[in-house]
């Protein structure tokens, strides 16, 4: 059974479902974990020509999850809300093992228009900065424009900004960006940077926010 470690998946579903019409959609999620976010996106694109990419290194690697706050140690919880501790009693920073990847892939087998790249975001950018090959309906296409991006990997301002700028440079009019856990980093810095690419606010929840790239026409 697929599980999510975030909130407001109903908003994620709505924002994916209401994408502007086009012949083909390429979506991506950074930070797949157990796959529920990717599942929600694909369920709402299943009646359209689409392909979805998941990016997550797994492998129990450690990284900065959120912007540090002086004097405050972040407390992480499991899916049941229990605080995670190390054996010495200190707060534990979560990692995501390869076994989680296998659990996710087993539960995700009905989604055929999907590929998982077991990479860090920067490694994906280095590998596919000139486009990613998509094999779909008997054709190979090198695609370098994305229509829907869910940012749910590292939640630091620097990391999210780097990711957002990569995809902003590879976006289409109507492309939507969804940001998760927006209270853990300086989301205003992200939105200000993306305004230069004509991204504007569609909707903001308590946990998630959606921006869309303008088609160049004046917005009401």
What annotation goes with each model-predicted range?
Residues 3, 10-220:
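S-adenosylmethionine/decaboxylated-SAM
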């Amino acid at each position: 059974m697929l599980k999510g470690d975030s909130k407001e998946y109903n908003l994620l579903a709505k924002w994916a479902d209401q994408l502007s019409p086009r012949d083909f959609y390429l979506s991506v999620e950074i930070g797949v974990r157990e796959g529920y976010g990717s599942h929600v996106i694909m369920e709402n694109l299943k009646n359209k020509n689409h392909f979805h990419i998941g990016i997550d290194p797994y492998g129990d690697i450690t990284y900065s999850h959120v912007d540090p706050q002086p004097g405050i140690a972040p407390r992480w919880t499991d899916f049941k809300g229990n605080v995670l501790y190390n054996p010495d009693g200190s707060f534990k920073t979560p990692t995501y093992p390869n076994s989680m990847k296998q659990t996710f892939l087993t539960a995700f087998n009905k989604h055929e228009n999907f590929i998982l790249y077991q990479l860090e975001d920067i490694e994906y950018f280095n590998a596919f900065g000139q486009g990613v090959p998509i094999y779909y309906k008997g054709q190979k296409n090198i695609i370098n424009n994305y229509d829907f991006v869910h940012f749910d990997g590292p939640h630091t301002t620097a990391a999210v900004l780097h990711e957002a700028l990569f995809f902003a440079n590879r976006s289409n009019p109507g492309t939507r960006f969804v940001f998760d856990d927006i209270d853990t980093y300086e989301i205003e810095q992200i939105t200000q940077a993306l305004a230069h690419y004509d991204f504007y606010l569609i909707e903001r929840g308590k946990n998630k926010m959606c921006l869309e790239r303008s088609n160049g026409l004046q917005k009401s």
